[in-house]
Amino acid sequence: MAWTLLHSKLHQNLQRRFPELQGTRILVAVSGGQDSLCLLHLLNDLTKQWQWHLAVAHCDHRWPTDAGIADHVQGLAQGYKLPYFQRDAQDLPQTEAAARHWRYHALTAIAKAENFPVVMTGHTQSDRAETLLFNLVRGSGSDGLQAMNWVRNLEESGSDKSPIRLIRPLLEISRQETGDFCQQQQLSVWEDVLNEKLTYRRNRIRGELIPYLKKHFNPQVEKSLAQTVELLTAEVAYLEQVSGEIYQTLSQTDQKSLNCRLLSQKPLALQRRIIRQFLQSCQSQSPNFEEIEQIVGLINAPNRSQTSSLPGQGIVRVEGDFLRYIYQGK
């Protein structure tokens, strides 16, 4: 094995963030593209040091452009002498979001069935920057701007077990670096033709906006945006913890009332988060910015003031010192 800069980056990053992964069973999601193939090759090279038990998972959307990819990935797994698991979509996903949702569901199913506590994907620093821009231009709060955390829980694997974790270990490595690595290692990359179609918004960000920003504003824009995400993630986590603790002191036992007199003494940033948590406990739909602002406007409003109807068929009304959620459905 030729030790490279990417081997060092990944090894050191895992030591710093995920030292508990020593000896773990890891399911590696492989699409056949350069990022996931780079991840697979690096993990395979580091297996002796980390004592991992690796396996390859591939999710076949069964799109016409995907013909042959599953066989290619299975061949890669055989070349590495690793177990291979595949899931085929029963209904062809019609959108990027639907395909992404199905992939995570399929990966979770494989991990549960085959007893893998960790799933790894090849998302890179470039993906993180693109997701931040995508969320920013469509409108998003600081929570949405976190854009790809290092780790998240996929699904509870059972009451007596820990959750299956999705880990993205390449978030400090750019797509340029994974491409160069695959060329240097002479890895057989499957080029996804859909990545070139500019009808997809994410592809336009990747193929047009990012290159423009690199050329005219900052050659290191991907790294800068990814660092912004890292800062936002830490700040959002802190604000969520603080607002959650305050929410528990302001809400009544029925979870339908909030003390607006005490809420008025909190900073606006915390008021918005507390109100969002309040609405999430009262209705199934997540509130949007306008709905939260309606309720912010009630904090110091006269008694009996109320919002217009909310998506969950409810309203929020001022009743004395409290904001009360009232369901109006049948």
From Swiss-Prot:
GO BP, sorted A to Z: tRNA modification
Transmembrane feature ranges: none
InterPro entries: Rossmann-like_a/b/a_fold (IPR014729), TilS/TtcA_N (IPR011063), tRNA_Ile_lys_synt (IPR012094), tRNA_Ile_lys_synt_N (IPR012795), tRNA_Ile_lys_synt_subst-bd (IPR015262)
Assigned keywords, A-Z: ATP-binding, Cytoplasm, Ligase, Nucleotide-binding, tRNA processing
A cellular component annotation (GO) from this entry: cytoplasm
EC top class named in words: ligase
Gene3D superfamilies: 1.20.59.20, HUPs
Subcellular location: Cytoplasm
One MF term in the entry's GO annotations: ATP binding
Residues binding ATP, per UniProt: 31-36
EC number(s) stated in the UniProt entry for this protein: 6.3.4.19
Catalytic reaction annotation: cytidine(34) in tRNA(Ile2) + L-lysine + ATP = lysidine(34) in tRNA(Ile2) + AMP + diphosphate + H(+)
Described purpose of this protein according to its UniProt entry: Ligates lysine onto the cytidine present at position 34 of the AUA codon-specific tRNA(Ile) that contains the anticodon CAU, in an ATP-dependent manner. Cytidine is converted to lysidine, thus changing the amino acid specificity of the tRNA from methionine to isoleucine.
Family note: Belongs to the tRNA(Ile)-lysidine synthase family.
NCBIfam families linked: lysidine_TilS_N
PANTHER family in alphabetical order: TRNA(ILE)-LYSIDINE SYNTHASE-RELATED
UniProt remark on domains: The N-terminal region contains the highly conserved SGGXDS motif, predicted to be a P-loop motif involved in ATP binding.
Name recorded for this polypeptide: tRNA(Ile)-lysidine synthase
Organism of derivation: Synechocystis sp. (strain ATCC 27184 / PCC 6803 / Kazusa)
Encoding gene per record: tilS
